[in-house]
Amino acid sequence: MDRMEGPPDVVVRRLPLYARSLRYLLQEGVESVSSQELGDRINVTAAQIRKDLSYFGEFGKQGIGYDVRRLLQQIEDILGLTQEWPVALIGIGHLGEAIARYEGFRQQGIRIAGLFDSNPTKIGKAINGMTVQSFDDAERVIREQGIRLAIIAVPARNAQEVADRLVMAGVRAILSYAPTVLQVPEGVWVRYIDPVAILHSMTYYLARDIAGVRHNNPET
């Protein structure tokens, strides 16, 4: 059976930006916000915000705006953040260790549930209250804990093998920092963070700015 068609991926990618801005508004004591005010914070038009939200139902009232707390709760519900998601982190080099130490995950529904590496010098190391385990144990731990999310922070040459084993263990969503494209089965979602590729996309705009070519600001 085909999956139900959902909103465009670019819309889903903007929802966390809306949620983050709404959290800031709550911290500032703001109770109500217009689509224009929200859009100004993240470089998105008011019309785009209204269109994005329309994929998921009706939000706010015309002329009144959005109740900040309620809209945040609704977006968190859409994103599945009403529950905590355990995550397996593979690769505990400098980058992986920094990710493991990041305190912002748990505050937003994400819990690093296991640290794994194949380097004997890393195995057994204590990081942020957890112990690095052998990657050979990852499949068992993932199955036992029902982990569906994983972060890959390994060299490109190892990334595909790691992804294959994660998928076999039941992982269905992967965030990869490895500078390579992963081949995964249908029904497995992959996102990439490649700082070099992102910087190259920014040098495109810088080069044209230096040359005097006018262009719109890239999407936030």
Curated annotation (Swiss-Prot):
Binding site for NAD(+): 91-96
GO MF annotations in UniProt: DNA binding; DNA-binding transcription factor activity
Main localization, broad class: cytoplasm
Location of the protein in the cell: Cytoplasm
Database matches in SMART domains: CoA_binding
InterPro entries on file: CoA-bd, NAD(P)-bd_dom_sf, Rex_DNA-bd_C_dom, Tscrpt_rep_Rex, WH-like_DNA-bd_sf, WH_DNA-bd_sf
A Pfam family this chain is assigned to: Put_DNA-bind_N
UniProt keyword Repressor present: yes
One GO biological process term: response to redox state
Keywords: Cytoplasm, DNA-binding, NAD, Repressor, Transcription, Transcription regulation
Cellular component, GO, one term: cytoplasm
Residues within the DNA-binding region(s): 17-56
SUPFAM superfamilies: NAD(P)-binding Rossmann-fold domains (SSF51735), Winged helix' DNA-binding domain (SSF46785)
Stretches assigned to coiled coil: none
Keyword S-adenosyl-L-methionine applies: no
HAMAP family: Rex
Protein family per UniProt: Belongs to the transcriptional regulatory Rex family.
PANTHER family: REDOX-SENSING TRANSCRIPTIONAL REPRESSOR REX, REDOX-SENSING TRANSCRIPTIONAL REPRESSOR REX 1
Function of the molecule: Modulates transcription in response to changes in cellular NADH/NAD(+) redox state.
The protein's name in its UniProt record: Redox-sensing transcriptional repressor Rex
Lineage of source species: Bacteria, Bacillati, Chloroflexota, Chloroflexia, Chloroflexales
